């Protein structure tokens, strides 16, 4: 097990039965992303939705809120999930939808641009971002693009499309950086490198060997090591 604070951006780790990738280390917390998306769902399929691309009223938010509440398996895991603020600005950075504080949410378009070199390509599905293509503009009657939301292709490219379509769910979390997490390729720092936990065959047993025999073997090995630096006649080579 390792402290989350010690993991570099781009490192994948296990938490609450899921795999996450570290995006960045912050003051006392780590911003992380689900390593692969979960099942698909519409961003918003509500018939009475006025602005379908407003995350605060979306089907996607309801699904993610339920997912994050069910995610932790222990009280320690639950306490490690910290609330964070999400910027719901649209593509031109207008702020009609404001911000929202949650425990899990998709990345914004700008976070995707910031971290895309660290994000593993999504293997099975396209997935939603949280950023709307456009917000309702009070001085314009045009509302068509208030149905559009940004999403990411499996190859890492990104585009926007109608919120009624179903794409993958790939939330980000903010976790307490003191959290102990496991790694699939983990080798404990204080391990010998030969025992079972390192994948080796274990150390030989010393049961039944006398102290005198052990001391004799130590002396023999010390003399043999010394011959590397001395000639056959005992002088320096």
Model-derived features: where do they sit?
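Collagenous Gly-X-Y triple-helix signature in extracellular proteins
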Residues: 1-193
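Short, low-complexity, charged amphipathic interaction modules
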Residues: 192-234
């Amino acid at each position: 097990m390792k402290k989350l604070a010690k993991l570099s951006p781009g490192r994948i780790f296990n938490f609450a039965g899921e795999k996450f990738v570290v995006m960045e280390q912050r003051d006392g917390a780590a911003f992380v992303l689900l390593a692969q998306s979960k099942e698909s769902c519409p961003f918003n399929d509500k018939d009475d939705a006025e602005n379908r691309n407003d995350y605060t009223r979306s089907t996607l938010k309801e699904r993610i809120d339920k997912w994050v509440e069910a995610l932790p398996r222990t009280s320690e895991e639950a306490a490690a999930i910290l609330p964070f603020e999400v910027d719901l600005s649209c593509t031109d950075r207008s702020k009609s939808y404001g911000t929202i504080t949650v425990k899990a949410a998709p990345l914004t378009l700008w976070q995707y641009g910031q971290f895309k070199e660290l994000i593993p390509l999504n293997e099975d599905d396209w997935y939603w971002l949280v950023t709307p293509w456009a917000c309702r503009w009070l001085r314009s009657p045009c509302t068509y693009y208030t149905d559009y939301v940004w999403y990411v292709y499996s190859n890492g490219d990104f585009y926007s499309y109608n919120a009624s379509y179903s794409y993958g769910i790939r939330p980000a979390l903010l976790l307490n950086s003191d959290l102990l997490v496991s790694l699939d390729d983990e080798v404990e720092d204080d391990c010998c490198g030969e025992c079972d936990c390192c994948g080796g065959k274990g150390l030989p047993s010393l049961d039944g060997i006398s102290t005198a025999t052990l001391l004799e073997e130590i002396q023999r090995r010390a003399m043999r090591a010394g011959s590397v630096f001395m000639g056959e006649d005992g002088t320096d080579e």
